[in-house]
Amino acid sequence: LMTTEDFMGRYKQLNTKSQDELAKELQVTSEQATILIPCARIYGRFIEVVGCKNLWVPGTDICDGVAMDYAMSRKKIMDKHNFDEDILNEVRGISKRYKGNTVHIQFVRSLAVQIFDVTKKIHGLSKRERLILELAAMLHDCGKYISIHNAAECSYNIIMATEIIGLSHREREMLAQVVKYNTTPMEPETDLTVIKLTAILRVANALDRSHKQKMQDCRFELKDSELVISTKSKEDIALEKGLFVDKAEFFEEVYGIKPVIRQKKFNV
């Protein structure tokens, strides 16, 4: 650990020396001395951009990073780190910042991914789109923190104004559109992937319209031209059924299958 002042002072000293002098003074090979100053310049630029006060020097260097990147691109080694989980954790923080209803969000997210998985042969979307669907479920109500009456537009603006590390600009825009169109009409030129994800999110969100998680045990199954949503819940789900109709109609327009809710009846 060293201060940025110490680092910049040391960098200025080394910058006046030749390659041979650096190799001798620091007891490194000539090859290592060759890249020392360019690397120091990169670190110096990072310090200027970030504005940090201290610099922690790990046991790895830029050469290790270059070698790692090359090996991964050639499938020589596999990185076991789950970068998707990093993105999910970051979005959890965004949701928390805008006072999202955690229980409702997690329930809608669970329903959405179940629908995605059971219909994967129909929509043909990838794991990356599945991740965007999860993120949309986690942020679908963030705009309510700013405005209840204009929540969809506020949600869109929040997402577009927030840099989410791990998502490209196009993916972030796709995420923002799915969240926006969850409750508002779509533009005619809307991307097909956005339409497919929005159809799933609308159905999942409608299944917890009361925010009381009445259908905890629901299961999803494709039968002929229907997406059957079965539940043994003893709760009154009249609200969910009533507000489910138009969401189901849109889903049917997109996928050609009709979502139907089937609640097991209990003898009183």
Regions found by a protein language model. Give the residues of each.
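Helical "lid/coupling" subdomains associated with nucleotide-phosphate turnover
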Residues: 1-202, 206-211, 222-229, 235-238
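Generic structural signal for residues in well-ordered beta-strands
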Residues: 55, 258-261
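Low-complexity, glycine/alanine/valine/leucine- and proline-rich hydrophobic stretches
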Residues: 210, 214-259
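Short proline/glycine- and acidic-rich turn/helix-capping motifs at secondary-structure junctions
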Residues: 262-268
